[in-house]
């Protein structure tokens, strides 16, 4: 109870059939029991197949998104770039400013604050780069590509 994990359904009503578990790949947690006969689950926080492993730490894009959305100076657009430096994976977070009125010092302070929040909440050290409004490339539908994986495919 209360631990986050993958939501799995099992049908127990079928008779004379094998018990099959259905993986949803949705991450959620079971809420504490109430007087209801059925268990309740919390909101879905991400997908297990979205997980990145950076230096042994499980990183979900939804964790970074949550931190970006808490900063009023940043737009809800972000991009995670995963690369390999030697034998270690690195993560760079690109965020987008809401307004183009910031000084270089205030941009550096915002980037440092986001970097500290990511280190504290997620547990991985990242490089944070903040871009002007519309600085992150969009797809044809207007969405930013959330994860760019630049690691070599053969290793």
Where are the model-predicted features located?
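Active-site glycine/GP-rich loop and adjacent strand/helix microenvironment
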Residues: 1-155
């Amino acid at each position: 109870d209360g631990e986050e994990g993958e939501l799995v359904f099992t049908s127990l009503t079928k008779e004379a059939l094998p018990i099959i578990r259905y993986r949803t790949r949705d991450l959620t947690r079971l809420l504490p029991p109430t007087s209801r006969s059925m268990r309740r689950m919390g909101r879905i926080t991400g997908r297990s197949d979205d997980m990145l492993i950076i230096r042994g730490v499980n990183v979900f894009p939804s964790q970074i998104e949550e931190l970006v959305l808490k900063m009023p100076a940043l737009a809800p657009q972000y991009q995670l770039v995963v690369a390999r430096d030697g034998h270690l994976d690195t993560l760079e977070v690109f965020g987008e400013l809401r307004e183009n009125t910031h000084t270089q010092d205030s941009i550096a302070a915002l980037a440092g604050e986001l970097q500290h929040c990511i280190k504290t909440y997620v547990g991985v050290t990242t490089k944070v780069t903040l871009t002007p409004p519309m600085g992150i490339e969009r797809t044809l539908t207007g969405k930013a590509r959330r994860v760019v994986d630049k690691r070599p495919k053969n290793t």
